[in-house]
C-alpha cells in the first residue's frame, strides 16, 4: 500500500509540473501574439509594449518554476 501512495505522489508532482508548463506555454504564446498585434497597430509604442511584454512574460514564466519547486518538494520532502 505504501508503494501505491508513493507512486501517486510522484504522478501528482509530474502532472502538476506538466500542467504548469503547458499553461505557461499557452500564456506566453497568447502574450506574444497580442504584443505583435499591438506593435503592428501602433509602432510608436513599441518600446513601452516591449517593456511590459518582458515583465509579464517573466511573471508568467515564474509559474512553472514555482511548480517545479513544489513538485520536487512533494517528491522528496513529503515522500
Curated annotation (Swiss-Prot):
- Main localization is membrane
Q: Does the keyword Signal apply?
A: no
Its cellular-component GO annotations read: plasma membrane; proton-transporting ATP synthase complex; proton-transporting two-sector ATPase complex, proton-transporting domain
Q: Residues at site: Reversibly protonated during proton transport?
A: 61
UniProt keyword Protein biosynthesis, yes or no: no
Q: How does it sit in the membrane?
A: Multi-pass membrane protein
* This protein's UniProt keywords: ATP synthesis, Cell inner membrane, Cell membrane, CF(0), Hydrogen ion transport, Ion transport, Lipid-binding, Membrane, Transmembrane, Transmembrane helix, Transport
> Molecular function terms in GO for this entry?
lipid binding; proton-transporting ATP synthase activity, rotational mechanism
Q: Which residues form a coiled coil?
A: none
User: Between which residues do disulfide bridges form?
Assistant: none
| Residues that span the membrane, as ranges | 11-31, 53-73
| Subcellular location as annotated | Cell inner membrane
Annotated NCBIfam families? ATP_synt_c (TIGR01260), PRK06876.1 (NF005363)
| HAMAP family documented for this protein | ATP_synth_c_bact (MF_01396)
Q: Which family does it belong to?
A: Belongs to the ATPase C chain family.
Q: What does this protein do?
A: F(1)F(0) ATP synthase produces ATP from ADP in the presence of a proton or sodium gradient. F-type ATPases consist of two structural domains, F(1) containing the extramembraneous catalytic core and F(0) containing the membrane proton channel, linked together by a central stalk and a peripheral stalk. During catalysis, ATP synthesis in the catalytic domain of F(1) is coupled via a rotary mechanism of the central stalk subunits to proton translocation. Key component of the F(0) channel; it plays a direct role in translocation across the membrane. A homomeric c-ring of between 10-14 subunits forms the central stalk rotor element with the F(1) delta and epsilon subunits.
Assembly: F-type ATPases have 2 components, F(1) - the catalytic core - and F(0) - the membrane proton channel. F(1) has five subunits: alpha(3), beta(3), gamma(1), delta(1), epsilon(1). F(0) has three main subunits: a(1), b(2) and c(10-14). The alpha and beta chains form an alternating ring which encloses part of the gamma chain. F(1) is attached to F(0) by a central stalk formed by the gamma and epsilon chains, while a peripheral stalk is formed by the delta and b chains.
- Under what name is this protein listed? ATP synthase subunit c
State the species of origin: Serratia proteamaculans (strain 568)
Q: Which gene encodes it?
A: atpE
Amino acid at each position: 500500500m505504501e508503494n501505491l501512495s508513493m507512486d501517486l505522489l510522484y504522478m501528482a508532482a509530474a502532472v502538476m509540473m506538466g500542467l504548469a508548463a503547458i499553461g505557461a506555454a499557452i500564456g506566453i504564446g497568447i502574450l506574444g501574439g497580442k504584443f505583435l498585434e499591438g506593435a503592428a497597430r501602433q509602432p510608436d509604442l513599441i518600446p513601452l509594449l516591449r517593456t511590459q511584454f518582458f515583465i509579464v512574460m517573466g511573471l508568467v514564466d515564474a509559474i512553472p518554476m514555482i511548480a517545479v519547486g513544489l513538485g520536487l518538494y512533494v517528491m522528496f520532502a513529503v515522500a
